[in-house]
């Protein structure tokens, strides 16, 4: 019970996560990408939780959620292990682990960062062949 309470979030945060999930798009049939357009003090937490939650959907093996924080676009990446999100986000200046990674991109808007992420995902798969 203590663990469940620790992972709980308030209704406002839950609604934000639900909206992010509802806007998710699939690339390569199993990678979810979504955007959190609001800028608030908890953007990075909301994006991380949404990226985690996207992995609970069947057939999604990796997820990336982009959000605004100050003058940066933050990316939270998650994977069930089949796709190395660390390698993908390192190409955008980030880092982490095979199943959990993040990046902060400056000097680009949300659409540019999203396209750059898709380019890096394409590059990742072309290198796997």
Could you tell me what each predicted segment is?
Residues 1-129:
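Hydrophobic helix-and-loop "lid/oligomerization" segment in the mid-to-C-terminal part
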């Amino acid at each position: 019970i203590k663990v469940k309470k620790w992972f709980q979030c308030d209704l406002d945060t839950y609604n934000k996560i639900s909206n992010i999930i509802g806007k998710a798009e699939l690339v390569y049939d199993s990678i979810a990408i979504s955007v959190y357009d609001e800028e608030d003090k908890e953007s990075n937490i909301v994006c991380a939780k949404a990226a985690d939650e996207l992995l609970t959907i069947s057939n999604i093996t990796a997820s990336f959620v982009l959000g605004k924080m100050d003058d940066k676009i933050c990316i939270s990446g998650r994977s069930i292990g089949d796709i190395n999100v660390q390698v993908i986000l390192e190409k955008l200046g980030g880092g982490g682990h095979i199943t959990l990674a993040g990046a902060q991109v400056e000097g680009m808007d949300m659409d540019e960062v999203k396209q750059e992420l898709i380019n890096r995902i394409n590059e990742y798969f072309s290198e796997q062949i």
